[in-house]
Amino acid sequence: MGKLALAAKITHVPSMYLSELPGKNHGCRQGAIDGHKEISKRCREMGVDTIIVFDTHWLVNSAYHINCADHFEGVYTSNELPHFIRDMTYNYEGNPELGQLIADEALKLGVRAKAHNIPSLKLEYGSVVPMRYMNEDKRFKVVSISAFCTVHDFADSRKLGERIVKAIEQYDGTVAVLASGSLSHRFIDDQRAEEGMNSYTREFDRQMDERVVKLWREGQFKEFCNMLPEYADYCYGEGNMHDTVMLLGMLGWDKYDGKVWSLSPSYSQASWHRSG
């Protein structure tokens, strides 16, 4: 019987890559990078063999899609922010078995999920960025699930999360799951882009994000789940926050009562532990 060892809501802010490079932004996202490396450390300590990523940069207009190729390899340049991420190489093993189990389980609840083992279907940066800092040595297999869902209902995303747990139970291994996406996600007007590098676009969003992280730390998931649809709407949650809905679906929704660790306060990077 498989085990879900760790679940986390993480950032994939592209300036993490800039933070590595010489220049004025060197070191600007070290806290976020350190948070990713701490999650990797905990996964290793728990014996995780596969990481599932809910990727809010994988936009889909029909169905839920699971990228579970045998192998992922490529050179990634962001088509929306090529001045942030350019020529980033990646090379990871996939897990077709687990991906297919997820699709099969989701279909049992009428969720239109499709597993793909297609060499030309590449990873998006919601997966590539965290794997850069968590999986440099290819310790973990990778499965990426679309989470920028344009015409999808929260109820289906929640069901998908529930069925992922069932799939993991059938899998002979230990799995971690990452909801890769921002909380509030309103981009600043282009002429003000430089001033927004290290600040929120709106004070309202900052206040809301801080409140949300406080709710998580205090275990107030009933309150958070009740506000989630409006929060995702009013604060422009990344991918409409389907990644977070999937994550909470896995963990029992508003009944989750496990531990929560906050690893990177600036980016609300939280690790939610569930043993089983």
UniProtKB/Swiss-Prot annotation:
Keywords: Aromatic hydrocarbons catabolism, Dioxygenase, Iron, Oxidoreductase. One of its GO terms (molecular function) is ferrous iron binding. Pathway: Aromatic compound metabolism; 4-hydroxyphenylacetate degradation; pyruvate and succinate semialdehyde from 4-hydroxyphenylacetate: step 2/7. Its cofactor is Fe cation. It comes from the Bacteria. It catalyses: 3,4-dihydroxyphenylacetate + O2 = 2-hydroxy-5-carboxymethylmuconate semialdehyde + H(+). GO terms for biological process: catabolic process. Its EC number is 1.13.11.15. Gene3D superfamilies: LigB-like (3.40.830.10). Transforms homoprotocatechuic acid (HPC) into 5-carboxymethyl-2-hydroxy-muconic semialdehyde (CHMS). PANTHER family: 4,5-DOPA DIOXYGENASE EXTRADIOL-LIKE PROTEIN, 4-HYDROXYPHENYLACETATE CATABOLISM PROTEIN. This is 3,4-dihydroxyphenylacetate 2,3-dioxygenase. It comes from Escherichia coli.
